C-alpha cells in the first residue's frame, strides 16, 4: 500500500482588525465624497474640470493604501531598532524644508517638500517619527521615566528642537500636536503624577507665551473669542464655518447643495471640510463622523492594552501614540470648525484633501494593524504551546 499523502498545511492568514478596518474605510469614503462635493467649483476655476480635485484625491487614497500595504509587512521590531536614526532623519527634513527654494511656500507658511509631484507636509512625517521615537525611549528608559523628572525632560529637549523648527515654518499647531503625543505617551508609560503635572504646567506656560508672541496668533485668539466682531477680517473664516453648521441643522441641506463652499468658506476641502459636512449632512453626518473617530480611538487603545498584556511594551506605546495623534488632531480640527478652539490649520485625519498627509496617515494606521496582527499571532502561539 502506498503511504498516505501528507495533509496540506493551512494557508497563513493575515489577521485584520475588522472594526478598525471598517472605521478607516468609512472615514476615507466619507472624506472622498465630501472633498468631491466641496471642491468641484475650485476644479472649474483651476483647470476647467469639476473632477480635478476628486480625481487627485482618489489617486492620493490609492497611493495611501498601497503605502499602507507596504508598511503592513514591516515587523514592529524593525521600527524599534530605527527609532533614533529615524528621529534624526525627521530633524534633517525639518531643516531642509526651511532652505529657500527647497521648501514649498503656501499661504505664508513653508511646510511642504515637493516629491514626485506630491507635496509632502514634513510635520505629518515628524508626528509619526515622534511616536516611534518616544515609544523606543520609554521602553529603554522605563525606570527613569517613572521615577525621575530628568527622564521626562530628556526626550522633550529633543522634541523641543523639532518644535522650534516647526515654529520657524511657522506651524504652531503641529508643534502642539507633537508635544501632546509625547506627554500622553509618557503618562501612559508610567510617569509619576507630581512631576508630570509640573511638566504640563511648564509646557502650557511656554505655549501660552509663544501663542501671544506673534500678532497673527493674537488675532486668531481675539477673533475666536468674538468672531462676529471680526467677521470681515480675522474672524471671517470662523464665522463662515459657523454659518455652515447653522444652515445644516439636523439633516443637512443635502449632499452637494451647500452654499458656503462656493468661495465663501476658505479651505473648504482641506482644514474646513468638517464645516461643509455639517452644512450638507447636518447633525446626523456630524454625529456619524464623531462616532467613527471615537471608535477608532477606543479600538486603538484596546489594541495597545492587548499588546501591553502580551508583554509587547514598545508596540503598546506606539499604538497609544498613534491614537493620541489621530484623536487629538481630529478633536482640534472639529473644534476649530465648530468655534470651540482657535484656528490651528490642522487637517482632519483620513478625510481632508491632501496627498502627503493622506499617505502618511494611511501608513500610520497600517502600523496599528500590524500591532494587532502580531499580538494575535503571539496569543495563538501561546495557546498552542500550552496545549502541547
Curated annotation (Swiss-Prot):
Record topology, Periplasmic segments: 41-57, 107-117, 169-170, 214-271, 337-348
EC numbers for this chain: 2.4.99.28
Topology of this chain in the membrane: Multi-pass membrane protein
Chief location bin: membrane
Example GO biological process: FtsZ-dependent cytokinesis
Domain of life: Bacteria
Single GO MF annotation: lipid-linked peptidoglycan transporter activity
Record field: transmembrane: 20-40, 58-78, 86-106, 118-137, 148-168, 171-191, 193-213, 272-292, 316-336, 349-369
A single cellular component GO annotation: plasma membrane
Location(s) in or outside the cell: Cell inner membrane
Record flagged with keyword Transferase: yes
Pfam families according to UniProt: FTSW_RODA_SPOVE (PF01098)
Stretches in topological domain Cytoplasmic: 1-19, 79-85, 138-147, 192, 293-315, 370-388
Reactions listed under catalytic activity: [GlcNAc-(1->4)-Mur2Ac(oyl-L-Ala-gamma-D-Glu-L-Lys-D-Ala-D-Ala)](n)-di-trans,octa-cis-undecaprenyl diphosphate + beta-D-GlcNAc-(1->4)-Mur2Ac(oyl-L-Ala-gamma-D-Glu-L-Lys-D-Ala-D-Ala)-di-trans,octa-cis-undecaprenyl diphosphate = [GlcNAc-(1->4)-Mur2Ac(oyl-L-Ala-gamma-D-Glu-L-Lys-D-Ala-D-Ala)](n+1)-di-trans,octa-cis-undecaprenyl diphosphate + di-trans,octa-cis-undecaprenyl diphosphate + H(+)
Record-stated family: Belongs to the SEDS family. FtsW subfamily.
Protein name: Probable peptidoglycan glycosyltransferase FtsW
Species of provenance: Methylomonas methanica (strain DSM 25384 / MC09)
Amino acid at each position: 500500500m502506498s503511504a498516505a499523502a501528507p495533509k496540506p498545511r493551512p494557508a497563513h492568514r493575515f489577521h485584520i482588525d475588522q472594526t478598525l478596518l471598517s472605521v478607516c474605510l468609512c472615514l476615507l469614503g466619507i472624506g472622498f465624497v465630501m472633498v468631491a462635493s466641496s471642491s468641484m467649483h475650485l476644479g472649474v476655476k483651476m483647470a476647467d474640470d469639476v473632477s480635478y480635485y476628486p480625481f487627485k484625491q482618489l489617486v492620493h487614497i490609492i497611493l495611501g493604501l498601497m503605502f499602507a500595504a507596504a508598511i503592513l509587512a514591516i515587523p514592529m521590531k524593525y521600527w524599534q531598532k530605527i527609532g533614533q536614526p529615524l528621529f534624526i532623519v525627521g530633524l534633517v527634513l525639518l531643516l531642509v524644508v526651511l532652505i529657500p527654494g527647497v521648501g514649498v511656500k503656501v499661504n505664508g507658511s513653508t511646510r511642504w517638500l515637493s516629491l514626485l509631484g506630491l507635496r509632502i507636509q514634513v510635520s505629518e512625517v515628524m508626528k509619526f517619527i515622534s511616536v516611534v521615537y518616544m515609544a523606543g525611549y520609554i521602553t529603554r528608559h522605563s525606570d527613569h521615566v517613572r521615577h525621575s523628572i530628568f527622564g521626562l525632560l530628556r526626550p522633550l529637549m529633543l522634541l523641543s528642537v523639532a518644535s522650534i523648527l516647526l515654529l520657524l515654518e511657522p506651524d504652531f499647531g503641529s508643534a502642539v500636536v507633537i508635544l501632546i503625543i509625547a506627554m500622553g505617551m509618557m503618562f501612559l508609560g508610567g510617569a509619576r503624577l507630581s512631576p508630570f503635572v509640573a511638566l504640563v504646567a511648564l509646557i502650557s506656560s511656554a505655549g501660552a507665551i509663544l501663542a501671544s508672541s506673534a500678532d497673527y496668533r493674537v488675532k486668531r485668539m481675539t477673533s475666536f473669542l468674538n468672531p462676529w466682531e471680526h467677521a470681515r477680517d480675522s474672524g471671517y473664516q470662523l464665522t463662515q464655518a459657523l454659518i455652515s453648521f447653522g444652515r445644516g441643522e439636523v439633516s443637512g441641506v443635502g449632499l452637494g447643495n451647500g452654499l458656503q463652499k462656493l468661495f465663501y468658506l476658505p479651505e473648504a476641502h482641506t482644514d474646513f471640510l468638517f464645516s461643509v459636512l455639517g452644512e450638507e449632512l447636518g447633525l446626523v453626518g456630524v454625529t456619524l463622523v464623531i462616532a467613527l473617530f471615537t471608535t477608532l480611538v477606543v479600538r486603538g487603545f484596546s489594541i495597545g492594552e492587548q499588546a501591553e498584556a502580551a508583554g509587547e511594551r514598545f508596540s503598546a506605546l506606539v499604538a497609544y501614540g498613534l491614537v493620541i495623534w489621530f484623536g487629538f488632531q481630529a478633536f482640534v480640527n472639529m473644534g476649530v470648525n465648530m468655534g470651540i478652539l482657535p484656528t490651528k490649520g490642522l487637517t482632519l485625519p483620513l478625510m481632508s484633501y491632501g496627498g502627503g498627509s493622506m499617505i502618511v496617515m494611511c501608513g500610520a494606521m497600517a502600523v496599528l494593524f500590524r500591532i494587532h496582527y502580531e499580538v494575535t499571532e503571539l496569543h495563538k502561539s501561546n495557546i498552542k504551546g500550552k496545549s502541547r
